Amino acid sequence: MVNASAQRTMAGQGYISADCLYDFENFGAKAEYGQYTLGGFWSVGASGHFYDAPTSSKYNLEYVHCYVFGAYMHRLVCTRRRSVNLYGGGGVFMGAEVLDPMSRLPKDTVLGIGRTAFLYGVYAGLSAEFFIVEKVAVMAGALVPLNFSSGIRMLNYDVCLGLKVML
């Protein structure tokens, strides 16, 4: 007889998840849908993250990255019953970078770049899932997005914590 707990990450099993993102200064959120494969899982979703950057004046430039993404994470190690799993992988993303979304900079501030820009890039990630009950897992991980088109910062980092629910 097959133990049901080992089937939680079987190929074809779908899930939804929600994560909080943090880079030790700013915050964001991510939501995704995915499906397990024999060696890991693929996912698609949307993410938004607030950032800020110092300027030559006393003000900080706030900006937001909003994007959709697609990824594949490969299972690196797991427990026998797959109640704890570690994944590594990456993905691609595209969306928008919005500068000063709350219009907090003085009106006479010249940025030298547009207020919105197309954003695209790739990212690498490491993720661990800890099943607390049969169909619910706590997720913890780290992401390093490389933005090819950002006018502010090319390389970012995020740590994430969230919940994953099996469908």
List PLM regions with ranges.
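Cleavable N-terminal export/targeting peptides
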Residues: 1-11
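Transmembrane beta-barrel architecture of outer-membrane proteins
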Residues: 13-15, 26-28, 65-69, 119-123, ...
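Outer-membrane beta-barrel domain signature
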Residues: 47-48, 53-54, 97-98, 102-104, ...
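Gram-negative (and chloroplast) outer-membrane scaffold detector with strong preference
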Residues: 32-107, 132, 136, 165-167
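Transmembrane beta-strand segments that form the barrel wall of outer-membrane beta-barrel proteins
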Residues: 10-24, 29, 41-52, 138-148
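Outer-membrane beta-barrel "beta-signal"
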Residues: 155-167
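Acidic, glycine-rich flexible loop segments
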Residues: 119-126, 130, 140
